[in-house]
């Protein structure tokens, strides 16, 4: 289940892994000397509301439109922190995760986008491909499984 915290106007910078791989390949093919540091981000940055729209479209599911105020989200997060402390279990919801969710996290990728690199996939296409892989496609016993937090 999903519950929107806040108005959803906070913006998030994201990158599709296929584009990151293509960018690294592009840089390796240039074979430039020296050290070059890049922040890879696919643009445009999306608001949480627009990101939910992409997810709804990709999964063909309606996400509940109920929104709770940020202060109530924090309160719930602190409640889960206390439960986690008492039970000594790590829970999926915490005050830290609420804080990250409602924050704007935007990064500057001007250097990447002025380097001549053209991403092979739009951010929306990358999100669609990722969501399909993670939540729609059938899995076999031979598929590798990666666990994250």
Describe the role of every protein-language-model region.
Residues 2-8, 12, 97-100:
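Conserved catalytic loops of nucleotide-sugar-dependent glycosyltransferases that act on lipid-linked
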Residues 3, 13, 44, 66, ...:
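Residues that recognize and position ribonucleotide moieties
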Residues 6-28, 36:
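Substrate-positioning beta->alpha
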Residues 17, 53, 76-117:
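Conserved C-terminal active-site "lid" loop/helix of NAD(P)H-dependent oxidoreductases
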Residues 21, 52, 113, 124-128:
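Generic structural signal for individual residues within well-ordered alpha-helical segments
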Residues 26-91, 127-131, 137-149:
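Mid/C-terminal beta-alpha module of Rossmann-like enzyme folds, strongest
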């Amino acid at each position: 289940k999903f519950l929107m915290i806040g108005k959803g106007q906070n913006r998030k910078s994201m990158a599709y892994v296929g584009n990151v791989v293509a960018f690294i390949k592009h840089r390796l093919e240039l074979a430039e000397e020296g050290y070059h540091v890049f922040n890879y981000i696919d643009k445009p940055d999306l608001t949480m509301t627009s990101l939910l729209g992409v997810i709804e479209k990709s999964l063909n599911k309606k996400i509940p439109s109920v929104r709770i105020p940020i202060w109530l989200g924090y309160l719930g997060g602190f409640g889960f922190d206390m439960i986690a402390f008492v039970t000594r279990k790590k829970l999926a919801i915490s005050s830290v995760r609420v804080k990250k969710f409602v924050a704007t996290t935007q990064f500057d990728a001007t250097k990447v986008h002025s380097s001549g690199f053209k991403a092979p996939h739009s951010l929306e296409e990358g999100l669609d491909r990722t969501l399909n892989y993670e939540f729609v496609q059938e899995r076999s016993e031979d598929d590798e499984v990666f666990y994250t937090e």
